[in-house]
């Protein structure tokens, strides 16, 4: 039984290409048409470059004459640039109480605005203690006021709902 060669990441190069004919693009970007694989390999060796399979799923597969080391480096660079540009959306939490004072409320609003500017979602948790549970309407009104105050910069993702002793609302930036 023959050992199975491990699957290699990336495109096939030079002798790894096992097709009789390929669509060839030379090092200048000129389309040479359908060429026998031996001729394509000879052209690549004469140029001192590699024959790289660019599009294996087309018929015939598209191969290009280029410097494979440089090609790999540029692909890695593109991938790392794409990873840098991605931002992971976090869910930040703001905790309130039904009897919150106006200044405390304004401070919480400022930090919420900062979270929205950074592109994060905000989970607003309104916690009820003891007899405050009897006055859930106060908490609901507070969350409605908060919703109106951030309407310009955020939208409601999850409406206020009661879970045990706390009311939760999730907001996301516009």
Curated annotation (Swiss-Prot):
One of its GO terms (biological process) is ribosome disassembly. Keywords: Cytoplasm, Initiation factor, Protein biosynthesis. Its main location: cytoplasm. HAMAP family: IF_3. Monomer. IF-3 binds to the 30S ribosomal subunit and shifts the equilibrium between 70S ribosomes and their 50S and 30S subunits in favor of the free subunits, thus enhancing the availability of 30S subunits on which protein synthesis initiation begins. This is Translation initiation factor IF-3. The lineage of its organism: Bacteria, Pseudomonadati, Pseudomonadota, Alphaproteobacteria, Hyphomicrobiales. The gene is infC.
């Amino acid at each position: 039984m023959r050992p199975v060669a491990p699957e290699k990441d990336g495109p096939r190069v030079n002798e790894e290409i096992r097709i009789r004919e390929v669509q060839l693009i030379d090092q200048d970007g000129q389309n040479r048409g359908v060429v026998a694989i031996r001729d394509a390999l000879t052209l690549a060796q004469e140029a001192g470059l590699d024959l790289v399979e660019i599009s294996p799923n087309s018929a015939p597969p598209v191969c290009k004459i280029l410097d494979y080391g440089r090609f790999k480096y540029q692909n890695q660079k593109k991938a790392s640039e794409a990873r840098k540009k991605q931002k992971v959306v976090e869910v930040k939490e703001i905790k309130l109480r039904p009897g919150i004072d106006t200044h405390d409320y304004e401070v919480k609003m400022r930090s919420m605005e900062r979270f929205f500017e950074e592109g994060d979602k905000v989970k607003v948790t309104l916690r009820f203690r003891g007899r405050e549970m009897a006055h859930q309407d106060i908490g609901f009104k507070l969350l409605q006021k908060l919703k109106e105050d951030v309407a310009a910069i955020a939208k409601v993702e999850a409406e206020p709902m009661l879970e045990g002793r706390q009311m939760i609302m999730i907001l996301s930036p516009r």
